Amino acid sequence: GCIGVLLAQRKRTLWGSAVLLLGFGPVGQAVGTRLAALGAHVTVAARRPAQRAQAESLGMQGAELARLARLAPAFDTVVNTIPAQVLTAPVLARLRPGSLIVDLASRPGGTDFDAAARCGHKAIHALSLPAACAPETAGEIVARTVREMLREREGAR
């Protein structure tokens, strides 16, 4: 999935590399914990304080999403999981030259792909990676998630 894309596209190993992860929902949590396990220095930019605190409890750095433009110059690798445009032209212009952006968010994604290209970044909209890499497992996870969501919904009534 995402880790495979990063390993294939980066010129350097993830070990010791600074990676900016946007969003810390279920996908962000899965990617973040794996990146950290591979030795990446992960900074999670999230809107909700609880998500930032959770990231910090797992050994990652937490940052306010509102500070994204100020954070950008420290990174050349970004993974986005937020399905709203957060990687705008002004933010992209502040990333290190030739940055790699892997956008996992559903269409239209969270990246201004045209602006990324103009800035000289490589931006990949990596949709449906679990289904492409491991379709049976992906189906099981989707089914389990839907069941959990239905249970939570019933419990809220």
Q: Residue spans of the language-model regions?
A:
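Rossmann-like adenosine-cofactor binding region
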Residues: A55-A131
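Adenosine-phosphate binding glycine-rich loop
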Residues: G1-G16, R107-R157
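Short beta-strand/turn micro-motifs composed of small residues
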Residues: G23, A46, A105
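Glycine-rich adenosine-cofactor-binding loop
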Residues: T13-A36
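Accessory recognition modules or surfaces
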Residues: G1-V19, Q51-M60, T77-V79
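NAD(P)-binding Rossmann-fold cofactor-contacting core
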Residues: L38-L58
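Conserved Rossmann-like nucleotide-cofactor binding loop
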Residues: V27, A50-Q51, R107
